[in-house]
A protein has these predicted regions:
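Extended hydrophobic leader/signal-anchor segments used for secretion and membrane insertion
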Residues: 1-230
C-alpha cells in the first residue's frame, strides 16, 4: 500500500507524491530500462546483482539491447562494468490505454499519473462529469449505489446530486516492480473490506534460477521484516 484514505496521490516521472511530498521508495523498487551492451550479460554477474533469467528474456540481438527491470543497486552494478555495458536508458511509458479509469485521462501513464484523491470514510467529494469516472466504481460497485448520468446531470439512487459521502476507507496499492505490476494504476482503489491482512515478515524466498543444492533458498531474506509496517 502506497496511498492511504484521504491522501492525494500523484506520480511524476516515476516518483510517488502524497499530498505534494515525494514518498520514500523501497530499496528493492524496480523500473524497466533499455540496457545496451557490448556482449550478453554473464550469468554470474546477473546472479550477483539479483537479476533473474526471466528479467533478461527480452534481448534484442541485432541491437544488443536488453529491455529489463532493474533495482538502483543492479543498475549501478551494470554501469560499473564498462567492459560489458554501453548505456542504460529509461524505457518510454506508453500504456495509458489500460490505466484506471479506462474512459478518461488518456495522457496518464504508469510513470506520470494523477493526481487522484483517495476516498476516506465519512468524507465528501464534489462530483463532476470530469471526475466521475475516478469514483464511479467505488460508488456503484463497492458501495452498492445506483449511478447514472442523465442530460449531463449525475444521479445517485434516482436523485440528482453533485457530491457523495463515502461509507468505506480506500487504499492505493502498487507493486515494487513498477513496470510489471497489475496494481491500482490499472484497477483503481481497494476498499477496506477487500484488505484481508498485512505482511509482517518473509518466511521463505526462493531463487528460481538455482537448484536446491545450488543456492535456491535465499537465506539472507528469510525471516526479515517487511519495511514500513505499522
Amino acid at each position: 500500500c502506497v496511498g492511504l484514505p484521504g491522501q492525494t496521490l500523484e506520480i511524476k516521472d516515476r516518483i510517488i507524491y502524497l499530498d505534494g511530498k515525494a514518498n520514500k521508495e523501497p530499496d528493492n523498487v524496480q523500473y524497466r530500462y533499455l540496457v545496451k551492451t557490448k556482449r550478453p550479460i554473464p550469468d554470474d554477474l546477473a546472479h550477483e546483482l539479483g537479476i533473474s533469467k526471466e528479467d533478461m528474456m527480452m534481448y534484442y540481438t541485432d541491437a544488443s539491447v536488453y529491455n529489463m527491470p532493474l533495482t538502483e543497486k543492479a543498475k549501478a552494478g551494470l554501469l560499473a562494468r564498462k567492459d560489458i555495458v554501453v548505456s542504460i536508458e529509461n524505457t518510454p511509458a506508453d500504456d495509458a490505454g489500460g490505466l484506471y479509469p479506462l474512459n478518461m485521462y488518456k495522457n496518464w501513464t504508469t510513470d506520470n499519473y494523477g493526481p487522484v484523491w483517495i476516498p476516506k470514510k465519512g468524507e465528501t467529494v464534489k462530483l463532476t462529469i470530469e471526475n466521475l469516472p475516478v469514483y464511479e466504481r467505488p460508488i456503484h460497485v463497492y458501495e452498492g449505489n445506483e449511478l447514472a448520468v442523465k442530460d449531463g446531470k449525475i444521479n445517485i439512487n434516482g436523485k440528482e446530486t453533485d457530491e457523495y459521502t463515502f461509507k468505506m476507507d480506500y487504499y492505493w496499492m502498487m507493486g515494487d516492480n513498477r513496470h510489471n505490476s497489475a496494481d491500482s494504476r490499472f484497477w483503481g482503489f481497494v476498499p477496506e473490506d477487500h484488505v484481508v491482512g498485512k505482511p509482517i515478515f518473509i518466511w521463505l524466498s526462493l531463487d528460481n534460477d538455482r537448484g536446491w543444492l545450488d543456492g535456491k533458498i535465499r537465506w539472507n531474506r528469510l525471516f526479515t521484516f517487511v519495511d514500513n509496517i505499522k
